[in-house]
């Protein structure tokens, strides 16, 4: 509800109606004063909460950054390196977000609190002082008027004239106070519209700018998040594969602990008790014994040290070993040995009957050799029947089930697998099995193929080359990694290399249908790494290298065409691709090392500065405003480039070949587009940088046209200059994961007709005089372009983009 204006003429009359209207203004002024106090109070609470929140986030990021992953083994995979660096990347991202927020919080008091407090104290407080003066002068005037009216007419003329002058003077003072008070209260009533709203607007502007920077960082984070999710999934797959092998190893160790021997360790070792004869009788002394069969050396370390004497290990050379007859001694599990260093016989006591058998077997004792309690499955050979079996399995899989989801991952029935293998490898009629029979489904055939390969007497990639292949996969030099594996493949025996080529060619065909069967090279590596490669010893250390076996198979699949194109060049060292300026090494994915964005200038200027429009002299001599009206944000389409050669480091054969047509895609697919951009996608054309490509969806114009913060500084380029828009990488080079210099495309609209872009206002000499020069218009333009650096447009027309 509006208030009637206070006329200056009413100040002289000072009527009851005037006083009533003035009282309404005073009540509104008091309500405004209370409102400003509440805004200041709640604003301080909000700023304090934001500061506390930012401090908590920074403390959280410090906690993340302080943690360092430890690992088992001597080398991490590429995916594990990405995971190990992830907390540091998270902390850097959180710190960047909170640094922007703290800048906004630091300026919030100057933007919101101080202007409101100044208005309340200076304007409203000054109005209250005017009110006090008005009331004081009015009280004095009416009091004097009452006394003046009670003067008797019989007073002297000089006294009456003096009294009249005094009343006129007080009336004049009261009238001036009334005019000043009415002017001031109406001025505050009108000026509060912008003096209160402008600080809140500036505060919201800085708040939304900070939020928009958070949105930009979220877009930067999207491709990193998807790459890290892929690394996490790959690592989880490696873990599942390793866990299965570790469980099998633990199971075997429970059944026969002595069957697993580490390389470089003694043939057998453990605790034995030795019979020692003394003058006062016989004692049994505990020793830790280690026996090396090749040199027949028995090392005995005493466990019970005699007081005052430090005994070291004793090395003895074994001559022979024989089991002690049970009736000849009252102790169990005993056997005798004879050595070159000691005369006579040494009687040893094992811990159990099984333990004595193992010691005697290792020492070639005069007792029947007891075999290991583990009964191995019947080993299969890499012969003609095996090749025939593998070819038949591959043919039926590629004919009937290559698009089956989870191919090779889904396990078939063990009964059916054994039935198929027994029928095919029957010595009476080997290979006489009809794979088209309905009894053999795809899961049974794939499981049978894996079972055959795992139970070969020697793995396809041999024990001899196992360490070299794992060592090559551990290298951080991607070129050496590929070259070394290429060289080692041609060191395999002929039939092994033929079988490996047959299998890898089949796996490449499977991966080409990964959209249907979901089996990527990484997934196939997890399945066939332990199948084609196997350490000779069953140890935990060997199990921890399974993930590198998976990487070897993954590289064979991804670079099948290069590896099997021919043997590498003859040289002492493994061949590597053509030399580069710097070696192409794996680098962990990162978002913290990208280019710094141009920092947005928050609104911190005084209101007086905003009233003057920034003007400059154009080349034709016309004075124009350098502040442009706001333009709706245009989101350019994300360009995709195609390199001439594929990346030999990570390219999947199942990746579809992109054409030059850029299709619209939703926001969730941005990470895929970015990864294609970095791995090599479609080539940039000038049309792609100047406007939407044919077939692309219409640009979605937001309903709220807020100016987004300027992107990270780029090299100046003209429209249509593709080279300045995207730098072409050398073939195969893998950059760090950074966000491309343009915004990702918006989701396409449902409407078929494209929206017409709003025309740019061209400010030229002919219409320069039509620009509104009012204070309101200048302030409006100032706030709409508060994030623009005013100095960047000097020396050119506002509409010039070149």
Swiss-Prot record:
Residues forming the PH domain are 265-368
Pfam families the record matches: BAR_3, PH, RhoGAP
Keywords carried by this UniProt record: Cell projection, Cytoplasm, Disease variant, Endocytosis, GTPase activation, Intellectual disability, Neurogenesis, Synapse
- Main subcellular location of this protein, as a coarse class: other
Q: Name one GO cellular component term.
A: cytoplasm
**Matches recorded under PANTHER family:** OLIGOPHRENIN 1, OLIGOPHRENIN-1
What does the subunit comment say? Answer: Interacts with HOMER1. Interacts with AMPA receptor complexes. Interacts with SH3GL2 (endophilin-A1). Interacts (via C-terminus) with NR1D1.
Write down what this protein is called: Oligophrenin-1
Organism equals: Homo sapiens (Human)
